[in-house]
Amino acid sequence: MSINPNPSFQEVVTKVLKENYVNCEGRARRYEFWMFVLFEIIVGVVVGFIVGFLIGLLGIKSLSFLIYVPDLVFLCPSFSLVVRRLHDIGKPGIYVLLAFIPLVGGIILLVFMCTDSVPETNEYGPSPKYGNVNPSSLNIDPRNMSPTP
């Protein structure tokens, strides 16, 4: 397994939208997750400006529904990416349902999305960050990711 430590922004977006659109199997790194979140924000802002401009130019307020099109397009890949991100930290994908608990669920998921990868291979596959390595061979304590003496 070859590991690309820093895939480009375009590679991440292409991977999420083409290869893993509805794939909930395997693992996804923090880098992949946050690059796709950045892409979603950029697209949302651009679409918002375009829709706002068209509404202002044409005066047709009924076009405002177009602002939700990116949300609908990104719903499936975002869901599957969160599931794969949960897998990467050793949590079951069902935890994605925490998003439906107002405020608290979102905070818990945010903490999970910021958590570093589990370095060892788990039930969801090898680590996309560390590869198929045994952390004990690297003298890494997987609990705190610092070298052991």
Regions found by a protein language model. Give the residues of each.
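Membrane-interface extramembranous regions at the lipid-water interface
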Residues: 1-39, 78-94, 111-149
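Hydrophobic alpha-helical transmembrane segments in multi-pass membrane proteins
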Residues: 31-85, 89-114
